[in-house]
């Protein structure tokens, strides 16, 4: 079974991500060891919480360069929730620079009548890269589970793999570019749809191993 390293920097619910990966047919290992990231077949960066503590926690564990090296190597990489946001250059939530792997900023939802912030609960994706491996075997507008007050705004729109609409605001819900994928929602909390997305990621890992 493919070995998927789940990065532990004390900013995520790692147990439910690992459970989802096991169901998807992978062997998850929770780690912040550079060697284990290098040895793994794929890497997942989960995360819940605030932007500044997250990037500080990654940097204090010397994980910034290993993450960049992993992505540059072509190894399948998946960011989840805050793990998507910290791939960007900066966030309105904090003052720390992000990893800057994807050009763009993290912005806050604007208050408007009839919506709550955070955007919390089930919502439908609009797939802007419908042929992305992440969306294989999914219905056209799948329902997934969100909890966030901030969203990513990439400079290059072609990296956007899906959007979601909250009130009148349509924002990026996922990005995909070559081996780098990241989602704002929580696949591990998104029932069968989320499990299928994790299974699709694991399938890509298998293909990479076989190539």
Swiss-Prot record:
Pathway in which the depicted protein is active: Amino-acid biosynthesis; L-histidine biosynthesis; L-histidine from 5-phospho-alpha-D-ribose 1-diphosphate: step 5/9
EC numbers: 4.3.2.10, 3.5.1.2
Coiled-coil spans in chain: none
SUPFAM superfamilies: Class I glutamine amidotransferase-like (SSF52317)
Main location (coarse class): cytoplasm
Record key words, sorted: Amino-acid biosynthesis, Cytoplasm, Glutamine amidotransferase, Histidine biosynthesis, Hydrolase, Lyase
Any one biological process term the GO annotation gives: L-histidine biosynthetic process
GO CC annotation, single: cytoplasm
InterPro entries the UniProt entry points to: Class_I_gatase-like, GATASE, Imidazole-glycPsynth_HisH
Domain spans labelled Glutamine amidotransferase type-1: 3-211
Reaction catalysed by this enzyme: 5-[(5-phospho-1-deoxy-D-ribulos-1-ylimino)methylamino]-1-(5-phospho-beta-D-ribosyl)imidazole-4-carboxamide + L-glutamine = D-erythro-1-(imidazol-4-yl)glycerol 3-phosphate + 5-amino-1-(5-phospho-beta-D-ribosyl)imidazole-4-carboxamide + L-glutamate + H(+); L-glutamine + H2O = L-glutamate + NH4(+)
Residues of the active site: 81, 186, 188
Localization per Swiss-Prot or TrEMBL: Cytoplasm
Stated role: IGPS catalyzes the conversion of PRFAR and glutamine to IGP, AICAR and glutamate. The HisH subunit catalyzes the hydrolysis of glutamine to glutamate and ammonia as part of the synthesis of IGP and AICAR. The resulting ammonia molecule is channeled to the active site of HisF.
Description of how the protein assembles with itself and partners: Heterodimer of HisH and HisF.
Protein name per UniProt: Imidazole glycerol phosphate synthase subunit HisH
